[in-house]
Regions:
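S-adenosyl-L-methionine
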Residues: 1-67, 78, 83-115
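Post-transcriptional modification and biogenesis factors for structured RNAs
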Residues: 17, 145, 188
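Short, glycine/acidic-enriched loop or turn micro-motifs at the edges of active sites
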Residues: 55, 79, 105, 126, ...
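A short helix-to-beta-strand connector/capping loop
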Residues: 70, 93-96, 169
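Conserved SAM-binding motif I beta-strand of class I
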Residues: 71-76
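S-adenosylmethionine
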Residues: 110, 114-172, 178-179
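Core SAM-dependent methyltransferase catalytic element
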Residues: 175-188
Length: 188
């Protein structure tokens, strides 16, 4: 089977190719969605920790480091995707840490350890996949229980048909942008 790749599109690692895991088990962030996020928040990454929940290939975490984040994490439960993310991290450097495990268990612990403000990028598998019917509810509960003083921003990539609440715990919806079947909602 032919390898799939994505390219870092901006910053100091611009042009670097990263391996993608199987599209059977992961859903890579669309280029237009990735571009919109980094166009909006590129200059706010400095001095921040970026956590990519449901990390897949760790592309968003690598792009965040490329654009000035101090440290980045990608959390991935799928073993094959995790192995690919580890390979990609070797291309980026020690600032990109790949964590194997359940996002809902690992992310709060990673957030709690941080001394710098956190940008959390939630990119769960769309709920149309088997076994993921309650994934959005779990993501909302995860965000609701995070400490406000540690979180700078929560970006939530989701199916456009989903209407997220105006408030999730201490976090308020800043804006939402639609890209066909995918939307990005920002909370602070």
């Amino acid at each position: 089977m032919k390898n799939l790749y994505a390219t870092i599109s901006s910053g100091k690692f611009k042009g670097k190719k990263l391996l993608l895991p199987s599209l059977q088990t992961t859903r890579s962030t669309k280029s237009i969605v990735k571009g919109s996020f980094f166009d909006s928040f590129r200059y706010e990454l400095a001095g921040k920790v970026f956590i990519e929940a449901f990390g897949g290939s760790a592309l968003m975490a690598a792009e965040a480091l490329s654009n000035g984040a101090t440290k980045a994490y990608a959390v991935e439960i799928d073993k094959n995707a995790y192995k690919i993310a580890l390979q990609n991290a070797k291309l980026i450097g020690d600032e990109l840490e790949i964590v194997s495990g359940d996002t809902f268990e690992m992310t709060p612990a990673i957030v709690a350890r941080q001394n710098l403000p956190v940008i959390l990028y939630l990119d769960p598998p769309f709920d149309i996949r088997d076994g993921f019917a309650d994934v959005y509810e779990k993501c909302v509960n995860l965000a609701r229980n995070l400490p406000k003083d540690k979180i700078y921003l929560i970006a939530f990539e989701h199916a456009s048909h989903l209407n997220l609440p105006e408030n999730i715990g201490a976090f308020t919806l800043l804006k939402s942008k639609k890209f066909g079947n995918t939307s990005l909602s920002y909370y602070s």
